[in-house]
Design a protein with these regions (language model features):
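PAPS-dependent sulfotransferase catalytic domain
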Residues: 1-102, 106-116
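Positively charged interface segments
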Residues: 112, 147, 152
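PAPS-dependent sulfotransferase catalytic core
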Residues: 98-142
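Generic structural "secondary-structure junction" signal
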Residues: 19, 61, 75, 119, ...
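Non-catalytic cap/lid and distal C-terminal segments of serine-dependent acyl enzymes
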Residues: 14, 20, 88, 136-149
Length: 152
């Protein structure tokens, strides 16, 4: 095993955009601004996500990186966590490894101090953003969404 094992987990930019915006708003309401607190509206959040997508593009050409879709982790946690354990060359039967895997299992991590996990619902942007906003997102990220494996 090399000393550095890189795992890159990405999420549908539309859901990531909504999540970042809401996370920033909650932090401001609590009087503790964070890295997302400047996302005060749809346009600022959209500009922020453009950088997110460009970063995703750069990771696609890197070698020896495990790239995982967030949604795949939620929908098939067993397979994706096994893939991660294999990539990291860990013994998945060891209690300390199982403890970490089980601690991050969807539904288990909610509300844990220090974890950036609030709702984690797939496709929630469709419920929150207007049809016009969804159209802007489709126009803006359409090609990238397809490359990332998402439906427009």
């Amino acid at each position: 095993m090399s000393l550095l094992q890189i795992t890159y987990i990405y999420r549908d930019p539309r859901d990531a955009m909504l999540s970042a915006y809401e996370y920033g708003r909650r932090a401001l309401e609590k009087g503790r601004p964070n890295a997302f607190s400047h996302l005060s509206d749809f346009e600022k959040s959209l500009a922020f996500m453009e950088d997110y997508v460009r970063i995703w593009e750069k990771w696609q050409v890197e070698k020896n990186v495990l790239i995982v879709r967030y949604e795949d982790l939620l929908q098939d946690y067993e397979a994706e966590s096994a893939r991660l354990v294999g990539f990291l060359e860990l013994d998945g039967s060891k209690p300390e490894v199982r403890e970490v895997i089980d601690g991050y299992r969807p539904g288990q991590a909610e509300g844990q101090q220090g974890l950036h996990f609030y709702k984690g619902k797939i496709g929630r942007f469709r419920e929150v953003y207007s049809a016009e906003q969804q159209s802007v997102l489709a126009d803006h990220f359409g090609t990238d969404l397809e490359k990332m494996g998402y439906e427009i």
